[in-house]
Design a protein with these regions (language model features):
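Alpha-helix-loop-beta-strand connector modules within alpha/beta enzyme cores
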Residues: 199-220
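Short aromatic-enriched loop/helix-cap "lid" or pocket-rim segments at secondary-structure transitions
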Residues: 196
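Proteins enriched for Cys/Gly/acidic motifs involved in redox and nucleic-acid/cofactor modification
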Residues: 1-193, 204
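Conserved radical SAM core fold
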Residues: 188-193, 219-220, 228-229
Length: 229
Protein backbone atom coordinates (compact mmCIF):
# COMPACT_ATOMS: atom_id res chain seq x y z
CA UNK A 1 0.00 0.00 0.00
CA UNK A 2 1.47 3.33 -1.10
CA UNK A 3 0.19 6.42 0.74
CA UNK A 4 0.47 10.09 -0.17
CA UNK A 5 0.09 12.82 2.49
CA UNK A 6 -1.28 16.35 2.07
CA UNK A 7 -1.00 18.79 4.99
CA UNK A 8 -2.77 22.14 5.28
CA UNK A 9 -2.35 24.66 8.07
CA UNK A 10 -0.07 25.02 11.06
CA UNK A 11 3.05 23.29 12.38
CA UNK A 12 0.87 21.27 14.75
CA UNK A 13 -0.82 19.78 11.70
CA UNK A 14 2.59 18.94 10.23
CA UNK A 15 3.41 17.06 13.42
CA UNK A 16 0.10 15.21 13.25
CA UNK A 17 0.82 14.18 9.66
CA UNK A 18 4.11 12.69 10.83
CA UNK A 19 2.13 10.64 13.34
CA UNK A 20 -0.12 9.40 10.55
CA UNK A 21 2.93 8.53 8.48
CA UNK A 22 4.66 6.67 11.31
CA UNK A 23 1.55 4.68 12.20
CA UNK A 24 0.99 3.65 8.59
CA UNK A 25 4.65 2.73 8.08
CA UNK A 26 4.39 0.48 11.13
CA UNK A 27 1.52 -1.28 9.38
CA UNK A 28 3.57 -1.85 6.24
CA UNK A 29 2.53 1.16 4.14
CA UNK A 30 5.04 3.07 2.00
CA UNK A 31 4.85 6.90 1.92
CA UNK A 32 5.15 8.41 -1.57
CA UNK A 33 5.50 12.02 -2.69
CA UNK A 34 3.71 11.54 -6.00
CA UNK A 35 -0.07 11.10 -5.61
CA UNK A 36 -0.19 9.41 -9.03
CA UNK A 37 1.83 6.53 -7.56
CA UNK A 38 -0.34 6.22 -4.45
CA UNK A 39 -3.08 3.77 -3.57
CA UNK A 40 -4.38 6.06 -0.82
CA UNK A 41 -4.02 9.67 0.31
CA UNK A 42 -4.47 11.31 3.70
CA UNK A 43 -5.55 14.96 3.60
CA UNK A 44 -4.89 16.68 6.95
CA UNK A 45 -7.14 19.74 6.87
CA UNK A 46 -7.16 23.20 8.45
CA UNK A 47 -10.21 25.28 9.36
CA UNK A 48 -8.71 28.54 10.58
CA UNK A 49 -10.52 30.40 7.76
CA UNK A 50 -13.28 29.67 5.26
CA UNK A 51 -10.61 29.76 2.58
CA UNK A 52 -8.77 26.93 4.34
CA UNK A 53 -11.91 24.79 4.10
CA UNK A 54 -12.26 25.61 0.41
CA UNK A 55 -8.62 24.76 -0.24
CA UNK A 56 -9.10 21.37 1.42
CA UNK A 57 -12.09 20.53 -0.76
CA UNK A 58 -10.23 21.74 -3.84
CA UNK A 59 -7.24 19.53 -3.01
CA UNK A 60 -9.48 16.50 -2.51
CA UNK A 61 -11.19 16.97 -5.87
CA UNK A 62 -7.86 17.41 -7.66
CA UNK A 63 -6.39 14.28 -6.08
CA UNK A 64 -9.34 12.21 -7.23
CA UNK A 65 -9.43 13.81 -10.67
CA UNK A 66 -5.74 13.07 -11.25
CA UNK A 67 -5.91 9.55 -9.80
CA UNK A 68 -9.47 8.14 -10.00
CA UNK A 69 -8.48 4.93 -8.17
CA UNK A 70 -7.13 6.82 -5.16
CA UNK A 71 -8.66 6.11 -1.75
CA UNK A 72 -8.87 9.46 0.08
CA UNK A 73 -9.03 9.78 3.87
CA UNK A 74 -9.78 13.21 5.33
CA UNK A 75 -8.66 14.20 8.84
CA UNK A 76 -7.76 17.34 10.79
CA UNK A 77 -9.52 20.41 12.12
CA UNK A 78 -11.87 20.98 9.20
CA UNK A 79 -12.87 17.32 9.28
CA UNK A 80 -13.66 17.68 12.99
CA UNK A 81 -16.08 20.54 12.33
CA UNK A 82 -17.47 19.44 8.96
CA UNK A 83 -17.56 15.66 9.20
CA UNK A 84 -20.86 15.25 7.34
CA UNK A 85 -19.77 17.59 4.56
CA UNK A 86 -16.63 15.59 3.82
CA UNK A 87 -18.46 12.30 4.30
CA UNK A 88 -20.85 13.43 1.60
CA UNK A 89 -18.13 14.12 -0.97
CA UNK A 90 -18.08 11.40 -3.62
CA UNK A 91 -14.28 11.62 -3.78
CA UNK A 92 -13.83 10.74 -0.09
CA UNK A 93 -13.46 7.17 1.18
CA UNK A 94 -13.39 7.95 4.91
CA UNK A 95 -13.30 10.79 7.45
CA UNK A 96 -11.64 11.04 10.88
CA UNK A 97 -12.95 13.77 13.20
CA UNK A 98 -9.61 15.18 14.27
CA UNK A 99 -6.05 13.89 14.39
CA UNK A 100 -6.15 10.33 15.73
CA UNK A 101 -3.38 8.43 13.92
CA UNK A 102 -4.79 5.03 14.85
CA UNK A 103 -8.17 5.87 13.33
CA UNK A 104 -6.56 7.28 10.19
CA UNK A 105 -4.35 4.23 9.70
CA UNK A 106 -7.23 1.91 10.53
CA UNK A 107 -9.23 3.20 7.58
CA UNK A 108 -6.36 2.39 5.22
CA UNK A 109 -4.79 -0.71 6.79
CA UNK A 110 -7.38 -2.04 9.28
CA UNK A 111 -5.96 -5.54 9.68
CA UNK A 112 -2.35 -4.58 10.42
CA UNK A 113 -0.91 -4.50 13.98
CA UNK A 114 -0.91 -1.24 15.93
CA UNK A 115 2.06 0.60 17.37
CA UNK A 116 2.54 0.44 21.12
CA UNK A 117 1.54 3.78 22.60
CA UNK A 118 1.14 5.69 25.85
CA UNK A 119 -2.28 6.88 26.96
CA UNK A 120 -1.56 10.57 26.66
CA UNK A 121 -4.28 13.25 26.73
CA UNK A 122 -3.33 14.50 23.25
CA UNK A 123 -3.28 10.95 21.92
CA UNK A 124 0.13 10.67 20.27
CA UNK A 125 2.83 8.04 20.16
CA UNK A 126 6.45 9.18 20.32
CA UNK A 127 7.92 10.19 17.00
CA UNK A 128 11.21 8.51 16.18
CA UNK A 129 12.06 11.09 13.52
CA UNK A 130 10.60 13.56 11.07
CA UNK A 131 11.16 12.65 7.47
CA UNK A 132 12.37 15.95 6.03
CA UNK A 133 15.18 18.35 6.82
CA UNK A 134 17.39 19.04 9.82
CA UNK A 135 14.47 20.22 11.96
CA UNK A 136 12.28 17.84 13.91
CA UNK A 137 8.75 18.81 15.01
CA UNK A 138 7.68 18.00 18.56
CA UNK A 139 4.19 18.77 19.80
CA UNK A 140 4.19 19.58 23.51
CA UNK A 141 0.59 20.77 23.82
CA UNK A 142 -2.68 20.74 21.90
CA UNK A 143 -5.96 22.64 22.07
CA UNK A 144 -6.77 26.10 23.39
CA UNK A 145 -8.67 27.59 26.33
CA UNK A 146 -9.25 30.95 24.64
CA UNK A 147 -12.65 31.72 23.12
CA UNK A 148 -11.80 34.12 20.30
CA UNK A 149 -14.89 34.83 18.23
CA UNK A 150 -12.97 34.71 14.93
CA UNK A 151 -11.26 31.33 15.52
CA UNK A 152 -12.66 27.80 15.28
CA UNK A 153 -9.57 26.12 16.74
CA UNK A 154 -11.08 25.84 20.22
CA UNK A 155 -14.00 23.87 18.79
CA UNK A 156 -11.89 21.76 16.44
CA UNK A 157 -9.07 20.88 18.85
CA UNK A 158 -10.72 21.12 22.25
CA UNK A 159 -9.34 22.43 25.53
CA UNK A 160 -5.63 22.96 26.14
CA UNK A 161 -3.90 19.67 27.00
CA UNK A 162 -0.21 19.28 27.85
CA UNK A 163 2.00 16.26 27.39
CA UNK A 164 4.01 15.08 30.38
CA UNK A 165 7.57 16.37 30.77
CA UNK A 166 8.93 12.82 30.84
CA UNK A 167 7.36 11.93 27.49
CA UNK A 168 8.55 15.15 25.88
CA UNK A 169 12.12 14.57 27.08
CA UNK A 170 12.00 10.98 25.81
CA UNK A 171 10.76 12.09 22.39
CA UNK A 172 13.37 14.87 22.24
CA UNK A 173 16.12 12.30 22.81
CA UNK A 174 14.80 10.18 19.96
CA UNK A 175 14.47 13.13 17.60
CA UNK A 176 17.96 14.38 18.54
CA UNK A 177 19.43 11.22 17.02
CA UNK A 178 18.23 12.38 13.58
CA UNK A 179 17.87 16.17 13.86
CA UNK A 180 20.08 19.07 14.93
CA UNK A 181 17.12 21.31 15.79
CA UNK A 182 13.76 20.55 17.40
CA UNK A 183 10.81 22.90 17.00
CA UNK A 184 8.16 23.00 19.72
CA UNK A 185 4.69 22.93 18.21
CA UNK A 186 1.21 23.23 19.60
CA UNK A 187 -1.75 25.56 19.45
CA UNK A 188 -0.86 27.68 22.51
CA UNK A 189 2.44 26.44 23.91
CA UNK A 190 2.71 29.42 26.27
CA UNK A 191 -0.10 27.71 28.17
CA UNK A 192 1.96 24.54 28.58
CA UNK A 193 1.60 22.83 31.96
CA UNK A 194 -1.43 24.76 33.20
CA UNK A 195 -3.55 21.61 33.09
CA UNK A 196 -1.01 19.32 34.77
CA UNK A 197 -0.95 18.52 38.50
CA UNK A 198 -4.56 19.54 38.93
CA UNK A 199 -3.89 23.10 37.82
CA UNK A 200 -1.32 23.83 40.54
CA UNK A 201 0.95 25.42 37.89
CA UNK A 202 3.99 23.46 39.07
CA UNK A 203 4.78 22.79 35.40
CA UNK A 204 5.55 25.58 32.95
CA UNK A 205 7.13 26.17 29.57
CA UNK A 206 10.23 27.71 31.17
CA UNK A 207 10.68 24.72 33.46
CA UNK A 208 10.30 22.34 30.51
CA UNK A 209 12.90 24.24 28.48
CA UNK A 210 15.36 24.23 31.38
CA UNK A 211 15.00 20.46 31.76
CA UNK A 212 15.43 19.84 28.03
CA UNK A 213 18.56 22.00 27.86
CA UNK A 214 20.04 19.96 30.69
CA UNK A 215 18.99 16.47 29.56
CA UNK A 216 19.17 16.85 25.76
CA UNK A 217 22.11 19.26 25.40
CA UNK A 218 23.31 18.47 21.87
CA UNK A 219 20.36 19.91 19.96
CA UNK A 220 18.87 23.38 19.42
CA UNK A 221 15.30 24.09 20.47
CA UNK A 222 13.04 26.55 18.65
CA UNK A 223 9.68 27.84 19.90
CA UNK A 224 6.59 28.37 17.77
CA UNK A 225 2.99 29.34 18.54
CA UNK A 226 3.77 30.65 22.02
CA UNK A 227 0.47 32.50 21.88
CA UNK A 228 -2.71 30.98 20.49
CA UNK A 229 -2.62 30.59 16.69
Amino acid sequence: MKVHFVTHGCKANQYDTEKFRQELEARGATPVDDPLEADAAVVNTCTVTNNADRQARKAIRKLKRDNPDLEIIVAGCSAALRFDEYQGMEQVSGVVEGHDAVQVAGLIAPEAPLLDRDEEPIGGELLERNVRGTRGWMKIQDGCDRRCSFCATKVARGASRSRSEDEIVDEARRLADAHSEIVFTGIHIGHYGHDLDGGKHEHSLSRLIARLLEEVPDVRFRLGSIEAT
